[in-house]
A protein has these predicted regions:
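Hydrophobic helix-and-loop "lid/oligomerization" segment in the mid-to-C-terminal part
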Residues: 2-20, 31-63, 69-71, 78-81, ...
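Generic enzyme active-site microenvironment
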Residues: 20, 24, 92, 117-118, ...
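Short glycine-rich anion-binding loops that position phosphate/pyrophosphate groups of nucleotides
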Residues: 23-25, 95-98, 121-123, 241-242, ...
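Short glycine/serine/threonine-rich phosphate/pyrophosphate-binding segments
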Residues: 27-33, 98-102
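Glycine-rich, phosphate-binding/catalytic loops in enzymes
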Residues: 35-37, 107-110, 133-134, 187
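Short, hinge-like loop/turn segments at secondary-structure boundaries
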Residues: 64-68, 110, 133-136, 288
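Active-site cofactor/cluster-binding pocket
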Residues: 69-130
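Short alpha-helices
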Residues: 118-188
């Protein structure tokens, strides 16, 4: 409670605010970052959003996208470092350990700014002055909405903010199909729709903006790279760097691929193993009766 009181006091006057999220941001990561940024700008703060890496092209419609700094680009890194050094408050969104932001992690750890961590993932690292965290939330965007309401500023949520937050909730619930689609999710989404969020347009922008190469890649992956083990109710994809290069893969092109494996009848656990320059990225999905999060936490960083 004391930390939240300090946080509210910090926000009571204009501040330099730095917002960041995890590598390869998805809709919840970018939506929560830009939704929060647009709200704080309306409150009179100077806000900078920095991502550790690039993010999918189908998220660039969000308001504030043009001002986002990509820390992995040398042309933007110096400015991002300067903004971090000037920050009075730092918001860390949609990640629970500082290793998820690459080089930015140690810079944040050393900063004297007030650090706020907003996240819904399990086992958070203790690096923040204020942890606004709940595994009961379906998405970080849901928590950002809750925070704005708790601060008494629900009236400041406009169409642009609502659409950023809606996008993150929609995708992190699998289009409102996953077990994390709670009553509260529907209540929050109803409020965002009342604020002007266009659900049909957002779905089209995220799910129906495929390039020809991406569709060909998905077809290739399903026909040539899908392994099904019916005996253990498991299916998985193994994608090499060569595969990604062949189809001129862009950031976000593997997004949602693992869901095709989970959609198979009788499959309870699905995985995607994707070879990258810096290692193997693994994505897991499971049915409600398989605790894949505990498995991932036990065996992977």
């Amino acid at each position: 409670m004391e930390a939240f009181a300090t946080f509210k006091k910090e926000l009571s006057s204009p501040k330099n605010i730095f917002i960041t999220t995890h590598v390869k941001p998805d809709a919840d990561a970018l939506g929560s970052s830009l939704g929060l940024a647009n709200y704080l700008i309306k409150k009179g703060h100077q806000v900078t959003v920095v991502t550790p890496t690039d993010y999918p092209y189908f998220l660039t419609w969000m308001k504030g996208n043009d001002a986002v700094l990509d820390f992995s680009k040398s042309s933007e890194k110096v400015e991002a470092q300067s903004r971090l050094q000037e920050a009075d408050l730092i918001f860390c969104l949609d990640f629970s350990v500082l290793s998820r932001v690459n080089e930015l992690g140690e810079l944040i750890r050393k900063s004297k700014a007030f650090v706020v961590n907003i996240d819904h993932h399990q086992d958070p690292e203790d690096f923040a002055d204020l942890r606004y965290w709940s595994t009961q939330a379906a998405a970080t965007c849901e928590l950002v909405y809750q925070l704005i309401v708790e601060l008494g500023d629900e009236s400041l949520i406009d169409k642009d903010i609502a659409e950023c937050l809606y996008a993150g909730i929609m995708t992190d619930t699998g289009g409102f199909r996953h077990p994390n689609t709670t009553k509260n999710v529907h209540l929050v989404v109803a409020e965002l729709l009342d604020k002007g969020a266009d659900s049909s347009q957002i779905a089209n922008l995220i799910y129906d903006s495929n390039s020809v190469n991406r569709l060909k890649f998905i077809g290739f992956a399903i026909t040539r790279r899908l392994v099904v083990r019916e005996d253990i109710h498991t299916a998985y994809f193994v994608i090499s760097k060569k595969d990604l290069k062949k189809y001129q893969s862009q950031t976000g092109d593997t997004e949602g691929l693992v869901n095709y494996a989970l959609s198979l009848d009788g499959i309870k656990l699905a995985a995607l193993f994707s070879e990258r320059e810096d290692g193997i990225k693994i994505s897991f999905r499971s049915s409600s009766d398989v605790a894949v999060n505990k498995f991932a936490a036990s065996y992977f960083n």
